């Protein structure tokens, strides 16, 4: 989508043809497959025994080509689907979501069917790759070949009676850390709006966030050609005249997910909103 400008539907179809996504792509695009893997890593790294559906999970279905254009407006950022488990004091933030990520971040360069695991270890003595990353494991994560090799390897281990499937020991005693409630996860956020083109909208949105003590960091508004607006309207099956809609993005200073969602729940019902706002975290901000 980023490089070709393809719609989500066309990009998904191509991924299915290449074997990167299942015929039923729900687990791939909803983030549930990534969540399952993240829960295993959270158990090993933090001693958390979590069930699917107990964490904040956001898929990629809301992402459109226009979001990549805004992300790359200065060539400085892109969008990646991240699965994150991060210790904050005696709690652990666990979530799966698309995220705005700086181009200079190592994970921004992971493309196609390649997967990467980036982790930070206290007093690791390793070579720091990123501020939040001491070590990286990179390899193919989708497609017939990698999947077949992984499955065959598991079958061979079972046949030999090896005990890898008995479970991995946790690095942290079970129960020592707790799951951070999703609504208390804190960060900066990207929010993309498509509204009716009229005056006063940004002020109203800013006031709504302000009432919840959330500050707007930046407002991005690009020039869109008639062709871009028409394609955007078609992708959402909008009835509005494409020349009368206005996409724009705001970024928010650090806030809790509860604050952000409360504001958006109010804004989405305003008469100037054409489609529900699209939002996701900005990764790597302090």
Name these PLM-found stretches.
Residues 1-2, 6-109, 113-116, 143:
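Substrate-binding/catalytic subdomain of NAD(P)-dependent oxidoreductase enzymes
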Residues 75-77, 86-91, 122-135, 223-246:
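Intrinsically disordered, low-complexity coil segments
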Residues 73, 88, 111, 129, ...:
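A generic structural signal for short, solvent-exposed coil/turn residues
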Residues 7-8, 12, 63, 68-78, ...:
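Short secondary-structure transition/capping segments
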Residues 150, 155-286:
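A conserved regulatory-domain signal marking ACT and ACT-like small-molecule sensing domains
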Residues 56, 80-85, 95-99, 118-120, ...:
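Residues in well-ordered beta-strands of folded domains
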Residues 14, 19-23, 93-196, 201-207:
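Catalytic, metal-anchored helix/loop core of enzyme active sites in primary metabolism
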């Amino acid at each position: 989508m980023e490089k070709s400008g393809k719609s989500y539907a066309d990009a998904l179809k191509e991924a299915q043809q290449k074997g990167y996504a299942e015929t039923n792509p729900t687990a791939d695009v909803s983030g549930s497959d990534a969540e399952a893997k993240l829960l295993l890593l959270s158990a090993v790294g933090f001693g958390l025994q979590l069930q699917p559906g107990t964490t904040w999970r956001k898929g990629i279905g809301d992402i459109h080509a226009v979001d990549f254009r805004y992300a790359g407006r200065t060539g400085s950022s892109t969008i990646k689907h991240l699965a994150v488990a991060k210790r904050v004091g005696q709690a652990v933030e666990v979530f799966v979501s698309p995220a705005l990520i700086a181009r200079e971040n190592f994970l921004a360069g992971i493309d196609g069917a390649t997967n990467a695991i980036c982790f930070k270890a206290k007093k690791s003595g390793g070579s720091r790759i990123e501020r939040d990353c001491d070590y990286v494991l990179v390899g193919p994560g989708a497609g017939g070949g990698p999947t077949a090799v992984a499955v065959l390897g598991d079958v061979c281990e079972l046949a030999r009676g090896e005990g890898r499937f008995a479970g991995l020991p946790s690095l942290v005693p079970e129960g020592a850390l707790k799951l951070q409630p999703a609504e208390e996860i804190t960060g900066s956020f990207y929010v993309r709006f498509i509204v009716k083109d009229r005056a006063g909208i940004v002020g109203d949105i800013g006031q709504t966030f302000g009432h919840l003590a959330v500050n707007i960091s930046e407002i991005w508004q690009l020039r869109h050609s008639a062709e871009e607006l028409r394609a955007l309207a078609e992708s959402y099956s909008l009835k509005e005249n494409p020349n009368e809609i206005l996409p724009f993005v705001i970024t928010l200073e650090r806030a809790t997910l509860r604050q952000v969602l409360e504001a958006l729940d109010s804004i989405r019902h305003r008469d100037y909103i054409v489609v529900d706002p699209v939002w996701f975290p900005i990764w790597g901000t302090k």
